């Protein structure tokens, strides 16, 4: 791994639970050079009152925190904003600004984290989810929930449906209502925290947890944006529908071909060149992400944040090709990109994609279908894999190894770095929800990659044992604060 930041992501809830000095001293002690925090005022809630922590992610009940919040490894949190919204920033936005925290709750925790980081020589970053819809899950917003958000603002699939199962409830990036929401959120963050070193954007791309999500978005706003750019939308619709229909007519031979040569996510249906309009859709989604990032960069500049680095999280290869996260061209707009190696999601994705294909093709053999999906997504299983069938694939337990190989992790990082080329630095973004022994191996896999820096999500999953592992890995590394 090249020279770059060593960062830890945390939330204001962890500070409120353990104490500012306890958490920040622990971050500094492991050899971190940077931290990134959420901005909300997070307090204990009730079931049905905002969101579960850890996030449910549709079927993630097994996930628990390593570091309890107020004595609990799972709980419900209610979020508020630490500051009164500026009405001028929200003028013309279809969504109302989020409510400010009641006076009985501390509103200064985000500022304390930033100032405390600086006092310890750490670079201070914040994280913003510009396009996560209010009431929908996912993202770093105080308005997240377990609902679906405004359906009309969600990505529309080629079959005319909108997802009912949601991990990340973002709106369509070409929807003016959604873009206005993102600008208001980012401008509010810059208004109060314009002195930070950087702002990481989460979910400034499309999603693909479910196979069907790779066939979006076909809303009127996307059509208008495409046609304004001279793109043949009719061809995109026809070839995307052709690929969709082809995936409903799979044979065992198609699965065998994918297992032998899974060189893109839908290799079981043929080559991408067989569906040129779908390839055009992927290029259009990448252009949509770039336009959204450029819009946010301009927003930050006009809000007084010209000196603040804008950075972007994204899916790693091969998913990034479906989500629109074009690391090379995105890296010409943002100052850094972070491929997310959140590997607890990967068995869930493999299962969900497989279940969809089996629903569409009920005569296929489940194990062969799963192997084909794993091959297409470059998810080889380790020799020690204990899972024996589709039913075993889901959110891993806290002490359960993930069905991954370290070579695949390094390969995905190197592929993202290769895609980025000479644009902005590509930094590893690891998740610490996993057994401690595996965490050590994941760190080593990242350090053997060509990524330029490493971030760990999240303090709440870093047990004391994992903090010791992180300290051993990072204290001997070439460290910078960039």
What residue spans do the PLM features occupy?
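Substrate-binding cleft/loops of secretory-pathway carbohydrate-active enzymes
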Residues: 132-144, 208-210, 306-349, 434-451, ...
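Aromatic- and acidic-residue-enriched segments that line the glycan-binding/catalytic groove
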Residues: 45-75, 132-165, 203-269, 331, ...
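Aromatic-lined carbohydrate-recognition surfaces of secreted/lumenal glycan-active proteins
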Residues: 9, 123-135, 200-204, 233-262, ...
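Short, acidic/polar
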Residues: 14-28, 178-190, 318-331, 436-447
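Aromatic-lined carbohydrate-binding/catalytic grooves of carbohydrate-active enzymes
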Residues: 32, 36-103
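Active-site-adjacent "subsite" loops/lids of carbohydrate-active enzymes
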Residues: 6, 10-11, 80-115, 123-194, ...
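Substrate-binding cleft of secreted/luminal carbohydrate-active enzymes
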Residues: 38-45, 334-352, 378-392, 396-477
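Aromatic- and acid-rich polysaccharide-binding/catalytic face
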Residues: 202, 237, 241-278, 325-397, ...
């Amino acid at each position: 791994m090249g020279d770059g930041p060593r960062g830890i992501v945390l939330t204001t809830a962890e500070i409120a639970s353990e104490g500012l000095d306890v958490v920040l001293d622990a971050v500094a002690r492991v050899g971190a050079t940077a931290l990134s925090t959420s901005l909300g005022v997070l307090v204990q809630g009730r079931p049905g009152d905002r969101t579960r922590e850890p996030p449910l992610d549709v079927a993630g009940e097994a996930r628990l925190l390593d570091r309890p919040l107020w004595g609990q490894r799972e709980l419900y949190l209610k979020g508020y904003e630490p500051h009164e919204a500026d009405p001028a920033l929200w003028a013309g936005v279809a969504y109302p600004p989020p409510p400010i925290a009641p006076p009985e709750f501390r509103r200064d925790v985000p500022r304390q984290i930033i100032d405390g980081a600086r006092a310890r020589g750490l670079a201070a970053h914040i994280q913003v989810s510009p396009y996560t819809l209010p009431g929908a899950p996912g993202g770093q917003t105080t308005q997240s929930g377990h609902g679906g958000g405004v359906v009309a603002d969600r990505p529309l699939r080629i079959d005319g449906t909108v997802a009912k199962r949601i991990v990340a409830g973002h709106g369509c990036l070409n929807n003016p209502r959604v873009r206005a929401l993102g600008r208001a959120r980012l401008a509010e963050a810059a208004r109060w925290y314009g002195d930070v070193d950087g702002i990481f954007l989460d979910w400034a791309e499309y999603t693909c947890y479910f196979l069907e999500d790779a066939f979006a978005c076909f809303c009127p706003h996307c059509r208008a944006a495409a046609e304004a750019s001279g793109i043949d939308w009719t061809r995109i619709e026809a070839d995307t529908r052709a690929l969709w229909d082809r995936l409903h007519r799979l044979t065992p031979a198609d699965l065998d071909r994918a297992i032998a040569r899974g060189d893109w996510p839908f290799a079981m249906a043929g080559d991408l060149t067989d569906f040129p309009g779908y390839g055009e859709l992927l290029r259009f989604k990448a252009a949509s992400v770039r336009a959204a990032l450029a819009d946010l960069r301009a927003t930050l500049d006009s809000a007084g944040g010209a000196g603040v680095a804008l950075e972007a999280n994204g899916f790693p290869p091969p998913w990034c090709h479906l989500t629109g996260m074009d690391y090379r061209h995105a890296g010409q707009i943002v100052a850094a990109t972070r491929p997310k190696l959140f590997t607890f999601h990967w068995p869930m994705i493999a299962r969900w994609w497989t279940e969809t294909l089996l629903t569409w093709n009920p005569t296929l053999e489940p194990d062969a279908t799963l192997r084909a999906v794993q091959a297409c997504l470059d998810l080889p299983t380790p020799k020690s894999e204990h899972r024996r069938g589709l039913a075993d694939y889901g959110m891993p337990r806290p002490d359960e190894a993930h069905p991954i190989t370290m070579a695949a992790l390094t390969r995905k990082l190197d592929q993202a770095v290769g895609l980025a080329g000479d644009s902005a630095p590509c930094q590893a973004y690891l998740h610490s929800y996993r057994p401690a022994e595996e965490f050590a191996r994941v760190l080593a896999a990242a350090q053997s990659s060509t990524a330029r820096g490493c971030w760990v999500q999240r303090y709440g999953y870093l047990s004391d044992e994992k903090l010791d592992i992180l300290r051993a890995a990072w204290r001997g590394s070439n460290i910078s604060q960039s």
